[in-house]
Amino acid sequence: MLELRPNCECCDKDLPADTATAYICSFECTFCAECNDQYLHLTCPNCGGELVRRPRRPAAKLVNHPASLQRIFNPDLKATLGKGR
């Protein structure tokens, strides 16, 4: 089952479980649409894998299968990507 991490690893933007603007790779590295469009271009900066839209979990299922609360944020990532890595 997907973790549904709560934030973008690049900019720390909140990404609720029901958002349509989250992207993940096969390792569930999680990014927002803005960082994907500006820096990542559908490629995970951590593993080099493909980024795809993260599916939304129906609200009724979140009761028994909640999204993760663990935030993963790399403040250096955005600076590195902004330099044309």
Please provide the spans of the model-predicted regions.
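Intrinsically disordered, low-complexity regulatory regions in eukaryotic proteins
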Residues: 1-85
